[in-house]
């Protein structure tokens, strides 16, 4: 028999990627409003384990953010 105080470990449900699905937004370097949601207060790209973006879409997102920074649409550092 199991111990009286033993509990099952808590498993957090894996979030789904916000860029996959039928009406998901397209990653575009010109869409600075969308890209700002994936940049931290300090201006760093937020990791996929926090945003739940898939690996393929995270690479696309990083490329779009870097492209927007280069063109001056997004800042490199936010003060």
Swiss-Prot record:
Record carries keyword Nucleotide-binding: no
Keyword annotations of the record: Ribonucleoprotein, Ribosomal protein, RNA-binding, rRNA-binding
Subunit record text: Part of the 30S ribosomal subunit. Forms a tight heterodimer with protein bS6.
HAMAP family documented for this protein: Ribosomal_bS18 (MF_00270)
Family assignment from sequence similarity: Belongs to the bacterial ribosomal protein bS18 family.
Cited function: Binds as a heterodimer with protein bS6 to the central domain of the 16S rRNA, where it helps stabilize the platform of the 30S subunit.
Listed NCBIfam families: S18
Protein name: Small ribosomal subunit protein bS18
Organism listed in the record: Rhodopseudomonas palustris (strain HaA2)
Upper lineage: Bacteria, Pseudomonadati, Pseudomonadota, Alphaproteobacteria, Hyphomicrobiales
Gene from which the chain derives: rpsR
